[in-house]
Regions:
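Short amphipathic alpha-helical segments
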Residues: 9-32, 64-67
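A short local structural element in Rossmann-fold oxidoreductases
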Residues: 14, 57-60, 70
Length: 95
């Protein structure tokens, strides 16, 4: 799952985000990467491995998480996309 969002304050967002690791674990969401945009560090992207699209959607739509997103300075709704892995390359060779 990819999530992209605009935030007002990275340090505040990261602090609140880090508090929610157990909630994400319980929803079957394992963080793989956090990115910031080179042109604007207030745009972030996250990559997660997920156990279930349904569980991830339920987590993201929960009132508690929606409120935490606001508290974490996320502007508007994050853009969420679900993808199926079709190929993986490690060191330029298939894994």
């Amino acid at each position: 799952m990819f999530a992209c969002a605009k935030i007002e304050d990275f340090a505040k967002w990261k602090s609140i985000y880090d508090e929610d690791v157990k909630l994400r674990d319980d929803a079957g969401m394992k963080e793989r990467y956090i990115f910031t945009c080179t042109e604007d560090p207030k745009h972030i992207a996250l990559l997660f491995a997920i156990d279930s699209i349904e569980k991830a959607k339920a987590f993201l739509e929960s009132p508690e998480i929606r409120e935490r997103m606001k508290k974490a300075t996320i502007v508007g709704d994050p853009e969420i996309r679900f993808f199926h892995k079709v190929h993986e390359t490690c060191c330029h060779e298939p894994c």
